[in-house]
Amino acid sequence: MLLPEGRSLELSKELLVGAIDIHVHAGPHIFSSPRRLDPIEAALQARDAGMKAIVFMDVFEMSNGTAWLVNRVVPDFLTYGGLILNTVYGGMNPRAVKTAIQYGAGAKYISFGAHSTYYQAAREGRVVEGKFVPLSELYPKFRAEELERCIRIPVDGPPPPELDEILQLIAANPDIYLNTGHVSPAEALRLVDLAGEYGIGRVLVASAVTKEASLEELQHMAANGAFIEYTLAAYTHTTPIPKTHYYVEREYASIDEGMDLGQTGSLRLAAEQIRTLGPEHCIIGTDFGVYTLPEPVEGLREFIACLLDLGFSPDDVRLLVKTNPERLLGMG
């Protein structure tokens, strides 16, 4: 493939102007897995690069509280947050959702779990003596105390009461988007279909699902109105290195996203999928913030630069980093 004309360092920086990173992990975090920067630093760096907004993700806290504070001290910039339904919040917990809706700046998203989905937690583990072993096999305590508390989405039949209540809460607050979280592709398909049934207008298929789903499954979800998320972190050097992403117990260090050998595929594959799905159906972000990666602004610039090298036009990139995130966030 001939490299496209016009690609340059300057162009990748120019395309940050007005951009939105919908997946930023800023501090604080657990001692054994510090963050690269704090939320105020993240906002200041994004603003100084000309970006329009960032969305904070936090596996332990309602990040809309963080957004409320940052918005008070960083002028001329917007940050958003929401709730990830991990076990620290009781998993499938309608009370947590009710609270998040009215807390701080108000939740902008509700995610159905990250490391606390059964699909991911059951597959998290690390290589021991040359063989991948799930944490649930290494530590019976993990299975009893963590795995059994994790979120599962029934793929058929009526939603259980807690899921029904949460979907009703999201539907009643149209400023909030549903984030599938790190569920299985089958569970994500079910959530997208349920969103349509409940009248939920904004849905994001999390990048953890995007890495696992087939192209046909992604096409189905996009055809039903969901945005498909691609994040650069899934394709970096740090992904297959065990870390304490969520659990404070150091023995629970695991490979990111629960992949037996780390995330498979490449950024080229992601680019091919975006082309096939259509950039109008996709959003890119970084999922950066971990201390082994660059700061999120640089991560987004690198993602943009790679897409330019892979033949995406500046207009396509603007769809992915500006127009579509604005639509998801209801920014007009």
Q: Which role does the model predict for each range below?
A:
Residues 1-78:
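An N-terminally biased module of ancient metal coordination in phosphate/nucleic-acid-related enzymes
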Residues 4-17, 40-44, 64-69, 94-108, ...:
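Histidine/acidic residue-rich metal-binding segments in metalloenzymes
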Residues 18-24, 54-56, 80-83, 108-112, ...:
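Hydrophobic faces of well-ordered beta-strands that scaffold small-molecule active sites
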Residues 22-37, 81-91, 153-158, 181:
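Active-site mouth loops of central-metabolism enzymes
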Residues 25-27, 59, 82-88, 113-117, ...:
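Active-site beta-loop-alpha junctions enriched in small/polar residues
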Residues 77-123, 127:
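A generic, well-ordered mixed alpha/beta core segment in the N-terminal half of proteins
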Residues 231, 277-296:
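Short acidic/histidine-rich active-site segments
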Residues 297-332:
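Mid-to-C-terminal alpha-helical segments outside catalytic/metal-binding sites
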